[in-house]
Every structure is written in structure tokens, then in C-alpha cells.
């Protein structure tokens, strides 16, 4: 730390968890306090700006590329910083929370990159926040091998050369970390806590390993938010004596407003940017959030009916690939969330074919890599990208100059021919309750109906219920979506779960709370910006 650093550290307000003192050292807490002092006020201003922009979208019912940044888009001369060697080849990336078992499995998976997730696939209990930091630090020092006490299975890292490169995803700007306050008494943003602790403890070690501190930035809504991250990176590197430009960040384009500012986001982060990623559920969730009162033309069908080949989704991914390659950045495709069944090979065969077709399409479209949720899908995705890339690390030379996407095409959401169905509504209720219940118990990555679901799934599920009710949607069976119908479905799901699980297991869960929270955010007249905010109030630990 520099001589000008404040002497007052951030204050821990949580009961101690194992090995907490290794993470929350005095110097680390001082670093967090300084991040908070310098950058939380700007974070707060940008969150307020989100609300103002939402109000503007509500008034106009549309979005457009920004006229004030047209010069950035028109300037052909600028590029993002070259990718470091460890991020040249990103053809398959695996995602998952940073618990010890996932850490070993992901690093050993054969994927080129592991997205170590502190965001949507991690419920932010204090124990999860601290243990995730410890898992990364232990992995970088090769002291993470362990034997599971329940299963007796041993987990051990392969040689360094065979391990995936870690790209860590902190929480989004909206989430607080209630267990840490600054000297001013203000609660620290979870994003600054996750980034700050990871960077403080591991940046130097990663450089010694020939890699670096690499991050995924979630839920950005504007280039001003990217500018804030860039300023944080510059400050953090200077404070710890890390060379400027060492950090690399990949931005998830998972909000509709960010889709209109992809070039500007890369420009703001150009010293540190390494790519953009195309999300799906959070992107659709963002469309509903921003255009929820824009009329029937913005009512989406069942979420599973909206594929990446829907015209408005294709416009988004085509523009992302073109933007990335024009500026020298990697374009990373979306998630394959299938979880293989150990009992039903037919389910696996059909799902693997679907994953293969999806990854074939992404590789053919010019993406440089893609995401999977399970190690068994790594070879499937790898085959798709190997067929296109061969021994090249990426295909950034495919500039896709033939692509031309208009502002209107990005929000032509009425293009899918599908319509809301009774099965889709029931699925939204069932998945919403099941996911929220697990999240409230501290689990953020949950296998539901053969898919690995995270908070984005719960967000799109509850948002669709809210949208269909408020739009007066009539399902394909002639039934109108009403609060009474949703309550009936939710009560039926609780009854089915009680019967399936048995009284003792059901009572040990948090099913009634999950049911109540889903109904609260799905049925309230006022749309909740994020499900995870009221859920965090109920999260214990």
C-alpha cells in the first residue's frame, strides 16, 4: 500500500468463519476501505442513473445507439489491448462457483478457462464469500487437494500446464456486502469486496505463474459503468505496484442497454478489455425489465421457446461478434447448461446433439469460444470449435464486415412465432420455487430438470410471470394468466414437493419462504429490479 493509504480499515460485522483471518488481513481491509471511499459514491450515482434511464425507456418505448458517442464508433483506429498468452485460446470455458470441489473439477476439466463465479451461481453467504477467496488462493498455491469426507473421493490438481486459466466474476454493482462496512459506516458493494480481496491476495502470485488477474464483469448497463471499472483497475494496480494494464476484463453483454453500447464499453476498458460474452437469460430478463410497460409487442413467449436463432437474439450476437473482432477482442458465446443424467442415456444423447448444434452455430458465426456448465460438455463444445479453429487460438481475423444491425432489430422482440403456454407458466413457477429455496440455503448453482440453473434463471422466470399477468396474456389453452392462477400453481407445486420429499426433508428446507418470495416478486404491482435483493435480506450466514 502507498504511504497515502488511509489507516482505517473496513469493519467486519459477521461472525467468524474458518480461516477468515487469512483473507481479512489488516492490509486487505484497508485496501477495501480505500476502494469503498473512492468508488462507492460513483457506484451509487450510476445506480441512480439506471433508474433515470429506465424511466426514459418507459416514456419513449425504444432505445437507440448513443449520438454523443458516435465518434467512438466511427473511429477505426482504436483497438483493445492484446490478449495475454493465457487468454489467447478461449475456445471452451466452464463456469461454476468457487467451492473447493468445483475449483478442482473446473481447473482439471480440459476447458481453456474457468469462470470462477462469485455472482449468479453463488449465493453470497459470508461463508461462501470467504471460502471462495480461499479456494482461489489455495489453488494458485497448489494446496487445494482434498478428500471428500462423505464420498471418500479424492480431488487433486493436474500439472499446471493442464489447468484452465481462471477468470473471476465478482458480484454485480447492485448487490451489497452487508458484513463489511467502511469507516464512514456505509455498506461496501459486493463487487468491490469480491474484486478487491481477489486482486489483493492473488495478483502477484498469478504474475509469478505467468498469468494475471483476469475478471468477468457482470450486468453492466452502460459505458459509464465500464469507465468506473477501468478507474478501479488503474487505482488497484497502482496501489499494489502491479504494472498498469496487467488486469484483463471480459464484459458480459447481458443487459439490453449494454447491447447498444458494446463499442463504447470496449473503448472505456481498452487498456484492460479482453472480450465480450453473449448471455441469454439475463439479457431476456433485462428486456422485460426495461420494456415491461411498452405494450404487447414486448411480451415474450416461454423462455425455452426463445432460442439464440430468434431474429432479435441473432441481431444481438451478430453485432457482438462484429464489434469484438473489429476491436481485437474475443467474442465468447453463451451457456450450455445441460447436466448429464447417470441413468438415462437417451436424455443425454438428445441433449448432447442439441449442445453440439448450438456450439457448431456459434463457431460458424465467428465466436472464439463458448460456455459450458458441466465437465462432460467440454469435449462436445471443444469438437465444435476445433472443427473451425483447428490449431488457431481464435478467429478474430473474421471481421464480419457484412453484418449490419439496426437499433430497431435489437428490440424486435415480437419476432418469435411462439406464444406463452400453460406448460411454460408452470415451468416458471416450479423452477422459480426450486431455485429460490436452494439459494436461501446458500446454494447458487442448482440442477433442476437436467439443467444447471443460476440466479438468471430465477430472474427470467419471475419476470415472465409478472409480465404475463400485467399484460393480460391468454395462454394457448384459453386461460388468462392472473394472480389467482399463479397462486394455485404455486400451492400445487408446494404440495407436490411435500409429497415427493416426505415430511422430514420438506420441513428441513425453506420451501414456504421460497414460495412466498416468488409470489412477492411475481405478483407485486411494482416490479422488483432484482430478485436477489429481497432474497439477500432472507439469506442466513
UniProtKB/Swiss-Prot annotation:
Its EC number is 2.3.3.9. The active site is at residues 169, 454. GO terms for cellular component: cytoplasm. Coiled coil: none annotated. Keywords: Cytoplasm, Glyoxylate bypass, Transferase, Tricarboxylic acid cycle. Pathway: Carbohydrate metabolism; glyoxylate cycle; (S)-malate from isocitrate: step 2/2. It is found in: Cytoplasm. SUPFAM superfamilies: Malate synthase G. One of its GO terms (molecular function) is malate synthase activity. PROSITE patterns: MALATE_SYNTHASE. It catalyses: glyoxylate + acetyl-CoA + H2O = (S)-malate + CoA + H(+). It is an enzyme of class 2 (transferase). The keyword Cytoplasm applies. It comes from the Bacteria. One of its GO terms (biological process) is tricarboxylic acid cycle. The keyword Metal-binding does not apply. It holds the Pfam family MS_N. Belongs to the malate synthase family. This is Malate synthase.
